[in-house]
Amino acid sequence: MKKIQIALDGPAGAGKSTIAKQLASHLDYVYIDTGAMYRAVTLAALEQGLDLENGPVLGELMKSLDIRLTPGEQGQRVFIGEREVTDAIRTNEVTNNVSFVARQAEVRSALVIAQRKLAERGGIVMDGRDIGTVVLPEAELKVFLTASVEERASRRHRENIARGMDSDLKGLQDEIALRDKRDSERTVSPLKQADDAIYLDTTELNIDQVVARLTELAEGALK
């Protein structure tokens, strides 16, 4: 059976990763978390004390980074070389700085090449900010997932608590609103809905409902 490329885009906290994982599992597809790749670069840059808004410097860093995504029992595992950074890339420090790194053309161009290679055989669900517009513009199914700032902050708050991290709901709302502004206004690959993407607001929907809707859309795209 033909396997397609599915592109899920949307702002921070829209539930893309959780939904993409379950959708991929349901369809027996491979899930590719592009956000984790940008987070890995951000972690490496922070650890080396680099200027997060210096594109050429980050471009040089990219040449030395071996970022790998592998499946694991609890979900996707992320490595830089042989070091696992699955949890390290989810800290508040990385979260608050990843948008600075992601706007650098040198970083995006390198990661886009890697992401396209991962997707070339189809049978993938890829989520991010510019998958349908830049990375996989020919994807057979494109969906733009979103939710209210309040709901997205609440989801992130619950995730942080579950990970045993300190979390401030009001602070998260402010951070997400600022992240939206940065992502939508950046010069390189801004966050926006692809012209042929389906808009899906998940504020009032649970995960199972969203996955069911996306499964229907995927089955329709296969016909």
From Swiss-Prot:
Q: What is the originating organism of this protein? A: Exiguobacterium sibiricum (strain DSM 17290 / CCUG 55495 / CIP 109462 / JCM 13490 / 255-15)
Question: What is the uppermost EC class here?
Answer: transferase
Under Gene3D superfamilies, the record lists: P-loop containing nucleotide triphosphate hydrolases
Single biological process term from Gene Ontology: pyrimidine nucleotide metabolic process
User: Its domain of life?
Assistant: Bacteria
**Phosphoprotein in keyword set:** no
Protein's gene: cmk
| Compartments where located | Cytoplasm
Q: Which UniProt keywords apply?
A: ATP-binding, Cytoplasm, Kinase, Nucleotide-binding, Transferase
Protein name, please?
Cytidylate kinase
Could you tell me what reaction this enzyme catalyses? CMP + ATP = CDP + ADP; dCMP + ATP = dCDP + ADP
- Give the signal peptide range: none
Q: Do you know which InterPro entries this protein is assigned to? A: Cytidylate_kin, Cytidylate_kinase_dom, P-loop_NTPase
